């Protein structure tokens, strides 16, 4: 009987109930709330669901992220190995390849001025960088946090891993993902505040047709030019353009379909669960998380405002031919930001079709955010 009682006592004490802190229970509730949003309200479920489940797992069973050096048998936790793919920049780069395979750069090629709007929207990144320095973060942490301003989830993870700021990767990833999802809520008030009714009603001329040759040359030329100037961008820009070359060449249909579908979804599962697993109670429930979330919001708002204001400048310089609303699409939340430009423009004039014009700055923003990340890597000597 004593043996049975002792065995039962050991089993009971090995349950998670005896090993978790109040913080773990808080994070379990947060994870369940995120799962509710993903399943019941379909709030960007492709990423939110695996992130939330990773968050749930690590706060119930922290050893699922156990480092091999701390394991009795030398084997790390399952999600630790998933996470190493984030840390080594493999998963974010593969995400970029999938995005490239799904992206049509035609609107950007047809209107190269869109590059300027995409660049202007990156202002929020550098505003957040100096804000983070002011709040007491060191320079590398500030750089990792600032990329949230581009509303680019994979790039945020990529830079945080490259700069060795894995301790704050969870809050950065959650903030970046949240603002990417909240584009339709955050952007419209800023866009309406900074533009007049007359400006919002401006109709832009139809974009010129883009030839197949131009579409094939674009990823090759961008890779050569950008990577020669800033070699540190090669993992992101290179993979983005490789995926796009798959799409536009027309000779590797199977690779295009795999990169944009099967491989993309596999990577999203690995990326989402591993990033969610970085949000343990110890890493997430602290003052720095609140600072990161606040900085991310400020950065995103600054980026949106900078894009719109630069759009207004281009409107004046073009004699009223450019609608400033497309400037807000310069953040790299593709295609949500472009759809918001279309929606806000249609509210002033239902016959105004801005979507294709906004896609130019939108895809330029993807390149711009990758370049900003590469710039920080070059500054800090990280390759």
Residue ranges and their predicted role:
Residues 107-129, 280-307, 358-362:
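Entry/N-cap segments of selected transmembrane alpha helices
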Residues 1-19, 25, 75, 189-218, ...:
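Intrinsically disordered, low-complexity non-transmembrane regions of multi-pass membrane transporters
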Residues 223-307:
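Transmembrane helical segments that form the transport core of multi-pass membrane transport proteins
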Residues 1-74:
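N-terminal alpha-helical transmembrane segments of multi-pass membrane transport
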Residues 167-185, 295-303, 326-329:
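Alpha-helical transmembrane segments
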Residues 60-80, 97-109, 131-142, 282:
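Transmembrane alpha-helix boundary signature
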Residues 175-251:
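Membrane-embedded hairpin module used as a gating/binding unit in multi-pass transport
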Residues 88, 96-102, 117-127, 131, ...:
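Alpha-helical membrane segments and immediately flanking helix-loop junctions
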